[in-house]
Amino acid sequence: MSEEADLIARSGGGDLDAYDRLVGLYQDRVYQVAYRITGNREDAWDAAQETFLNAFRSLPRFRGASAFSTWVYRIATNAALDLIRRRPPQPPVSLEDVAVSAGDDPAETATRSELQQRLHHAITSLPADQRVVVVLRDVQGLSYEEITAVLRIPPGTVRSRLSRGRESLRRQLADLAPAAGV
């Protein structure tokens, strides 16, 4: 039995230490999914916390029909989308702050920061159905099959939403292509 499978089994039986270790394995990835969907850190932390609370409550019913990661990404996606639905639209917040070291060229740092802000704004401006698919595929690296399982939508729908989302990003970021080397 793998370490993850052991942690899942023990967590399902109420072992809080095992669940804490399981959360440690997934917390960064769950936060990233939530952040890319919600567009800000506070909502992402709220969604991540909600994800792990819901997962803990539901873990005794997890039967392994899909990978644990697929299951937890589904919970995270739902939690993030629920936050978006409940809260009024908020202005986007910049991506992770760019660390500036003494050797960094200030012009490069400013350009990199601007590129990150534009990309973040472009992603958060996508309709939620397209944003989720773009985040899961292009940011988190999930396969089409995994996205189909997470979102419970047909593969053709995944492909069309991804295509529309990418096209929208291309249009929004077209002026950056020469500067970014794309």
Model-found features: residue ranges?
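Amphipathic, Lys/Arg- and hydrophobic-enriched alpha-helical face
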Residues: 23-41, 58, 123, 168, ...
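Short, Lys/Arg-enriched C-terminal cap helix and immediately downstream tail that follows
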Residues: 63, 85-88, 131, 166-182
